[in-house]
Amino acid sequence: MLGSTGSIGTQTLEIVSELPDKFKVVALSAGRNIDLLTEQVSQHKPEVIAIEDENLLTDLKNNINNLGISNPPIVLGGREAINSVAAWDSADTVITGIVGCAGLIPTMSAIKAGKNIALANKETLIAAGSVVIPALKESKSRLLPADSEHSAIFQCIQGLPNYENADFSTGQIPNGLKAIHLTASGGAFRDWEVEDLKNVTVEDATSHPNWSMGRKITVDSATLMNKGLEVIEAHYLFGTSYENIEIAIHPQSIIHSMIEMEDSSVLAQLGWPDMKLPILYAMSWPERFKTNWKRFNLTEIGQLTFKKPDEVKYPCMGLAYSAGKCSGTMPAVLNAANEMAVDQFLKEKISFQEIPIFINKTCESHLNKINLNPKLEDILEVDNWARIFVQEEIKKGKKYINVG
């Protein structure tokens, strides 16, 4: 479990606790939260753990020693230690819950080691899909989505003819698939007027009406960048053209996504808005394990509604489509610029409406430098460049015309 102390990590370990006869934890990694990591070690007794912040390694080792467990785990520290955990020999599946592009290198380590990937870190494919997909083919690893929308698409696609589930991660468009319809809750501001967005606070933007998620992804949901990034991810996972991937605002978050077939038939996957279900399916596929979770009840829901996203209200959505169509290194630049802009918003250095402004400026500055056939080192280089560029532009205090 990469990112065991984050939102995806804690929910994954809850699943393991509920189904101890189905899963065993052998390796955990975290960024800085050594107290929670220590609790997880006490409960799950992995073979190895790693903390990214090496300054906390001594404290973590002391915590583990104080547990007094009979077979304590190997304790590692530093970024390279995270890669070691990702490729740990006794693991057969790696759940990637590290937020942002920081999860790219560990995910690549797991792929090269031949592990099956339950991908909750969408930035890995968005920034480096052109590198990740060939690596999956070479290693024979299988990638399954652990986020709700792409899990929904994956589940629906299994109803298509002549579709080999094991070849899911090849990025080849399945037989009979015409279009993908991604649903979006609309985020924290779906009922706000555009003119009111200038008054958005960090607290406003990190309060999601439907889902329990981390702060960064909750802000991405509010800007609809999360859905824009998922468009790019869907393109790489399922081979669908950007013109055939559509977004619909669905406030109830009951239909998690839909696929449209060549004969105009539509398949949808429904369920309560709970991240544990797609995580479990990515871990259990192709089996379905019995749970005691709340059963689905359509009459309790009452109604399902949909509407087209407002492009003025959600400029990040258009930026994501444009970056995806540019291809090459542009999606990596978009992703890095977004991560940095959201980080600066959370630190109250910029306003909510400035997030797409700085992303747009960064992408514009990269237009004449796009590498259409990047290697991994090229992806990492532009990722670093975009982060620095956003920081420098914010320091200048410049204001740009809103891309909306």
UniProtKB/Swiss-Prot annotation:
UniProt KW Isomerase keyword? no
Q: Which GO terms describe its molecular function?
A: 1-deoxy-D-xylulose-5-phosphate reductoisomerase activity; manganese ion binding; NADPH binding
- Amino-acid positions noted as binding NADPH in the UniProt annotation, renumbered to this chain: T5, G6, S7, I8, G31, R32, N33, N121, E123, G214
| Enzyme class, first EC level, given as a word | oxidoreductase
Q: Any idea which positions bind 1-deoxy-D-xylulose 5-phosphate?
A: K122, S148, E149, S185, H208, S221, N226, K227, E230
GO BP: isopentenyl diphosphate biosynthetic process, methylerythritol 4-phosphate pathway involved in terpenoid biosynthetic process
Look up the record and name the cofactor or cofactors this protein needs. Mg(2+); Mn(2+)
Q: Which reaction is catalysed here?
A: 2-C-methyl-D-erythritol 4-phosphate + NADP(+) = 1-deoxy-D-xylulose 5-phosphate + NADPH + H(+)
| Pathway assignment | Isoprenoid biosynthesis; isopentenyl diphosphate biosynthesis via DXP pathway; isopentenyl diphosphate from 1-deoxy-D-xylulose 5-phosphate: step 1/6
Q: Which UniProt keywords apply?
A: Isoprene biosynthesis, Manganese, Metal-binding, NADP, Oxidoreductase
InterPro entries to which the protein is assigned, alphabetical = DXP_reductoisomerase (IPR003821), DXP_reductoisomerase_C (IPR013644), DXP_reductoisomerase_N (IPR013512), DXPR_C (IPR026877), DXPR_C_sf (IPR036169), NAD(P)-bd_dom_sf (IPR036291)
Entry annotated with the keyword Membrane: no
- Please tell me where Mn(2+) binds in this chain: D147, E149, E230
Quote the EC number.
1.1.1.267
Tell me its family. Belongs to the DXR family.
Known role: Catalyzes the NADPH-dependent rearrangement and reduction of 1-deoxy-D-xylulose-5-phosphate (DXP) to 2-C-methyl-D-erythritol 4-phosphate (MEP).
By what name is this protein known?
A: 1-deoxy-D-xylulose 5-phosphate reductoisomerase
